[in-house]
Structures are given as C-alpha cells and as structure tokens.
C-alpha cells in the first residue's frame, strides 16, 4: 500500500476549528479536542437562539405597541382587532418603530380609527 502524506491537510482542518473558537477561555481555545466540542456546542446554541431571537423581538414589538396604545386609551388587543377588521394587516415591527420614533404619528393613526364597532 502506498504511503499517504496529508499532514498539512490535517493541520489546516485543526487550525480552522481553533480559529473558530479563538474567543473561548482556557483550554477551549488551545486544545483541539475541547475546541472541537466547544464548536459543536456553539453551533447548537446559535441555531437554537436564531429562533429565540425572532420570538423575543416579536414580544418586544408587541410590548412597545401596547404601551403606546394604552397611552392613547386603547389596549393592544383592541387595536390589533380593529386593524384586522378593517383588513389593515399590521406589521408589528413597523408599528413599534412608529410608536417609539414618532409618537405623534402613532397617536394620529389611533385617532383616525373609529372604535365604535369594537366597543359594542
């Protein structure tokens, strides 16, 4: 059987993994085996937290819209319900940005809506 020399390929693979975990503490950034485990754990965490970030941001947007709506005398669920009745499908991110950055515009939106249908 012929001899296969692939030393630099293995070194390249190990260096790539060590570069990935270079910000870790202690042996996790120095030793290959622990670095490999750290990389696997990091990839699991980042995959999980991508979904969590989406949920957290949606909660933040809803909280901001609710605070701005209550400042104008309407609860969040009534506000959203009325938007759906008028077939104005809300983008919560945009509504939250309007509520935070331009409260006058948000209060104008609320005042232009008629809440008679909802309050029945």
From Swiss-Prot:
GO MF term set: rRNA binding; structural constituent of ribosome
BP terms from Gene Ontology: ribosomal large subunit assembly; translation
Record has Glycoprotein as a keyword: no
Coiled coil: none
Source species, domain of life: Eukaryota
PANTHER family attached to this UniProt entry: 39S RIBOSOMAL PROTEIN L20 (PTHR10986)
Protein name per UniProt: Large ribosomal subunit protein bL20c
Stated role: Binds directly to 23S ribosomal RNA and is necessary for the in vitro assembly process of the 50S ribosomal subunit. It is not involved in the protein synthesizing functions of that subunit.
Cellular-component GO terms for this entry: chloroplast; ribonucleoprotein complex; ribosome
Keyword annotations from UniProtKB, A to Z: Chloroplast, Plastid, Ribonucleoprotein, Ribosomal protein, RNA-binding, rRNA-binding
Pfam family, one: Ribosomal_L20
CDD domains named in the record: Ribosomal_L20 (cd07026)
InterPro entries cross-referenced by the UniProt entry: Ribosomal_bL20, RIBOSOMAL_L20_CS, Ribosomal_protein_bL20_C
Family: Belongs to the bacterial ribosomal protein bL20 family.
Compartments (UniProt record): Plastid, Chloroplast
């Amino acid at each position: 059987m012929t001899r296969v020399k692939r030393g630099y390929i293995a070194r390249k693979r190990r260096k790539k993994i060590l570069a990935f975990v270079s910000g870790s503490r202690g042996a996790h950034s120095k030793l290959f085996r622990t670095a490999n485990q750290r990389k696997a754990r990091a990839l699991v965490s980042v995959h999980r937290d991508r979904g969590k970030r989406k949920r957290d941001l949606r909660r933040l947007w809803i909280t901001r819209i609710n605070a701005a709506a209550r400042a104008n005398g309407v609860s969040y669920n009534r506000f959203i319900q009325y938007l759906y009745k008028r077939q104005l499908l809300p983008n919560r991110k945009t509504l939250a940005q309007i509520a935070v950055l331009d409260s006058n515009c948000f209060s104008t939106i609320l005042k232009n809506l008629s809440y008679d249908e909802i309050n029945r």
